[in-house]
Amino acid sequence: MNVKAYAKVNISLDVIGKREDGYHLLKMIMQSINLYDVLDIRIIDEGIKITSNRRNIPTNDKNIAYRAAKLFMDTYKIDKGISIHINKRIPVAAGLAGGSADGAAVLKAMRDIFKKDVSDEELINLGVKIGADIPFCIVGGTAFCEGIGEKITKLRSMNGKIIVLVKPDFGVSTKMVYTEYDKCLDVKHPDSEGLVKAVNNGHFKFVVNNMVNVLENVTAVKYKEINEIKEKALEYNSIGTMMSGSGPTVFSFFDNTKEAEKYFYEMKKEYNKVFITRTV
């Protein structure tokens, strides 16, 4: 079975507290985009076999897809094995939920392959054990996510919007960013409820004008390239630009393909990982 695992961007990201176990409590609007990994998932006699087109992708339990497969097999007493080939297109350590997207795709595919009568809600409760972005990746589309990411409210679709992604040539540790965020003072927070209302009313201009990601207070301060990329996007008439997740990828919305392509080709001169895509 071939399945697509879609990346995401954060239209807003706010940290509102911290649980006793150390996980941060969040309010986020998340959006799927048409940049995806392709997973070829097949039944084998036993075990979990992971392969990939990329050498730097782990093939053991450090891989979220591996952990998702094991959790599903243990939970539903699967007596067969599974092989997963990951054709990786989503950049890693980028703030795009590349690993979580793969984990979510594995859970959904295994539900179908092994014909298990399991709801999305049950998969979400499983998935959150191994990755806070997995619940959203199971649901996809446009959604408001709360808790540590497991409380999902579907929003009106914002599909078809043109986005250019620029990932600087370094990765960022999510754990490091959240640890450093705890030391931040005087943080500007997004109007999460106002943004949710705007999304549901189709007020896209309000949405792009009011995007806030509080984690920029860490990543964009540590890496000056993030603000440089955002400034360049605005020079090329982006209608809204922000860092996704813990970074370092910057996504920028454009009104039309022509302007997006100008910016795309300009950024390709400097960065290896630049993509034109759309929201889905």
From Swiss-Prot:
Gene3D superfamilies registered for this protein in UniProt: 3.30.230.10, GHMP kinase, C-terminal domain
Pathway connected to this protein: Isoprenoid biosynthesis; isopentenyl diphosphate biosynthesis via DXP pathway; isopentenyl diphosphate from 1-deoxy-D-xylulose 5-phosphate: step 3/6
One Pfam family cited in the UniProt record for this chain: GHMP_kinases_N
Chain sites annotated for binding ATP: P91, V92, A93, A94, G95, L96, A97, G98, G99, S100, A101
Enzymatic reactions: 4-CDP-2-C-methyl-D-erythritol + ATP = 4-CDP-2-C-methyl-D-erythritol 2-phosphate + ADP + H(+)
Gene Ontology molecular function: any one: ATP binding
SUPFAM superfamilies per UniProt: GHMP Kinase, C-terminal domain, Ribosomal protein S5 domain 2-like
PANTHER family recorded: 4-DIPHOSPHOCYTIDYL-2-C-METHYL-D-ERYTHRITOL KINASE, CHLOROPLASTIC
Identification of the protein by name: 4-diphosphocytidyl-2-C-methyl-D-erythritol kinase
